[in-house]
A protein has these predicted regions:
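Charged, terminal alpha-helix-loop-beta segments
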Residues: 2-477
Length: 477
């Protein structure tokens, strides 16, 4: 067996010897045939939907005719010819449309193709179970990304019979993708104009269940099923997402925090890190020091003075350095905390990041819990870039805060000392650059509970220099 580098060298030598001065389809096909022979097997993708693993001996090229695994196609064009991948445009007999055939050496697919293969296999595995459950035949399968309607390629869609539609999500997807099927189902329902069944992986429905309990209109507009890898069963609305409130006590580190912040008082910001029982000192959202009662650590190294000088050059508005684009939401959070009283009438001495905590959840959104001067809880969700799931992610946080507010968990665990928390629903505030609210934002917000107090704040796109409120929709109080 030739090693990959020697194979590539051999292929390039053969290709160089065969390459004519002008393009010649016959020579191009011969190059293709030789390249196929250099590998023991190939994985073939047909239009990104069907995947076949075929031995090289089972692939034949006769003139412009291509045969493999029981398929026969006429080669129209060899669009890309590389040592480990080939893309061919070909047409079946009596067909007017061409297929795109992608050949990948061996059984290992590049990441996008492997992802597509996994999702395709999942979609196919659902077909028999859907037919049994709905009592009708699946007539169409759809997997492509529908950007026009905001439905990603992570959500297989199927049509069944004349009046039913299905949308599902693979158990192997990340948590935000699984939870996003609720939003995708709403958009799919508007497109397909049929009764939609939503299939959720068994054991991964806690967040969706919590949302549906709070959103009866959505719960009743769809049929909800769970998939255990073999069968479909009705979704049970019993166990929602698990959250908890960590005890909070301000660590006795004032002197050390003051010493570090004095190095660059206009640039460094102390923020409580409740899980570590420490104070996190940040430069435009990046942690440069962590102070607890036992020690001070420096995640980016020390001494701090040259580090801060370097960060000030690289992580600044208008910079093209990668550090200027890293962790932008943390930067926006930092600017918002620094100007909080200019944006919202809340207490600066009672701002808690990531409270309460979500057990086992992947939350890629920044949450702040604070309180108004007169004791009303305020939940702040921050997004620096467009995210179609923002309304429902914000709902998750608000539901958790409300559950713990009603139970008195915040006061019991040391939050808001000396402040009387009003027995009223928390106000939900969503903050993002005005042009970064997704076009579906208004439509999804309309599904939120009518009793939820909501405030949308759109800030300027140049928030890295200075935050300015361009839109304030809703009421605080």
């Amino acid at each position: 067996m030739l090693c990959p580098d020697r194979k590539r060298f051999r292929f390039l030598m053969i290709r160089s010897a065969l390459m004519p001065r002008r393009y010649n389809p016959g020579v191009r096909a011969e190059e293709f045939r030789i390249l196929l022979a250099l590998e023991p097997s190939w994985t073939i993708s047909i239009n990104g939907r069907e995947f076949l693993h075929v031995r090289s001996s089972e692939i034949a090229i006769e003139g412009s005719r291509l045969r493999f695994g029981g398929f026969t196609r006429t080669i129209l064009d060899i669009e890309s010819l590389r040592p480990t991948s080939v893309r061919v445009r070909a047409r079946a007999r009596l067909r007017s449309t061409a297929d795109v055939l992608s050949f990948y050496s061996g059984e290992t697919l590049p990441s996008p193709a492997a992802l597509r293969q996994r999702r395709t296999a999942f979609q196919r595995s659902l077909v028999p179970a859907i037919s049994r459950h709905l009592g009708t035949r699946v007539t169409r399968q759809i997997l492509h990304s529908d950007k026009q309607h905001g439905i990603g390629g992570a959500y297989p869609r199927l049509l069944a019979g004349r009046s039913r539609a299905v949308i599902a999500v693979d158990p192997d997807e990340a948590t935000p993708v699984v939870n996003g099927v609720l939003r995708a189902a709403i958009h799919w329902s508007a497109v397909v104009k049929r009764r939609v069944t939503v299939i959720i992986p068994a054991g991964r429905s806690q967040t969706i269940v919590s949302r549906l309990v709070a959103l009866p209109r959505i719960r009743e507009s769809f049929d909800w099923l769970e998939w255990d890898g073999t069968d479909l069963a009705p979704l049970t609305f019993e166990q929602g997402m698990e959250t908890y409130v960590q005890p909070y006590s301000q660590p006795a580190v004032e002197a050390e925090v003051a010493r570090i912040v004095a190095i660059a008082p206009a640039l460094l910001q102390p923020v409580p890190h409740i899980a570590r029982r420490a104070v996190s000192i940040r430069f435009r959202g990046l942690e440069v020091a962590s102070v607890d009662e036992k020690a001070t650590t420096y995640p980016l190294g020390e001494p701090l003075e040259p580090l801060i000088e370097s960060l000030a050059r690289e992580r600044r508005p208008g910079s093209r350095h990668p550090l200027a684009r890293a962790h932008e939401e943390a930067w926006l959070e930092s600017n918002l905390i620094g100007r909080m009283r200019d944006v919202l009438p809340v207490r600066r001495d009672a701002i808690y990041p990531q409270v309460p905590s979500f057990r086992g959840e992947e939350r890629k959104i920044i949450d702040l819990l604070t309180i108004t001067d007169d004791g009303r809880l305020v939940v702040i969700e921050i997004k620096a870039s467009e995210d179609p799931d923002l309304p429902f992610q914000a709902l998750d946080y608000w539901l958790a805060v409300e559950r713990h507010r009603k139970a008195g968990d915040f006061e019991a665990n040391g939050y808001f000392r000396g402040i009387r928390v009003r027995n009223e629903p928390a106000i939900l505030v969503m903050v993002a650059p005005l042009l970064s609210f997704h076009r579906s934002f208004e439509r999804l917000v309309a599904f939120l509970p009518p009793a939820l107090p909501l405030l949308q704040i759109g800030v300027n796109q140049t928030w890295k220099r200075e935050i300015k409120v361009l839109r304030r929709r809703g009421a605080l109080g």
